[in-house]
Amino acid sequence: MILDASMKLFVEEGFENVTIRRIADLIEYSPTTVYLYFKDKDEIFFSLHDIGFQKMEEMNRDLVTINNPLLRLHKMGENYLEFGMSNPEFYNLMFIQDEPMNKITELGCDWVKGDHAINRLKETVTECMDKGYILKGDPHLVSLSVWSFVHGLVSLAIRGRIEKFVPEKEMILPVMKQSLNWLVNNIEASPAESRNPAGT
């Protein structure tokens, strides 16, 4: 109930207007009761941030069935776009809002959920390079470029900026996927380059 109420207030009024008292009022608890479960609102939003990553992980569960690493990378990008467009509030907490990262700094711990997603991307990019599917390069740099590309698309879309390029709302996600296709096509190795048959 506490997390549901927090997300409702966050969506309707923004992070700055969410307080423990307002959360308590919404669910008819006393603020003291809320504090029994969460130290502060940053901790509440950190928990929501974790739930968002769990949702994204569920979307990516079938990636292991895709043997071709380039197709897997492409599907990973599509899933990212679809997740961000379907869950803008969670996306905000996971990749845009400062508060969850502030909580990580306060706790002195690693960004476990984010690191897991990033490592999966790096592993897939490295496999693509090793098997000749994409141009050889620094896998860290290529992974950062791929992530930055899809993150930029989602951020522009959920903040209402992408309409400058795509006025029709129903075309936003299809155009984002076309942009992803362009990226993948441009990092793909040319047919002339040798490719490990085992990767086909």
Set out the residue ranges of the language-model regions.
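Amphipathic alpha-helical linker/stalk segments
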Residues: 50-75, 105-106, 111-117, 122-130
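Hydrophobic alpha-helical connector segments
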Residues: 61-89, 142-146, 189, 193-200
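Hydrophobic/aromatic-rich alpha-helical bundle segments in the mid-to-C-terminal region
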Residues: 107, 130-179, 191-200
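Hydrophobic/aromatic residues within well-ordered alpha-helical segments
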Residues: 41, 48, 52, 56, ...
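Alpha-helical DNA-contacting segments of helix-turn-helix folds
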Residues: 44-52, 94, 102
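Short hydrophobic clusters on alpha-helical segments that form packing/core surfaces
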Residues: 2-10, 18, 52, 56, ...
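Helix-turn-helix
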Residues: 1, 9-43, 47
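Short secondary-structure transition hinges
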Residues: 86-123, 141, 169-170
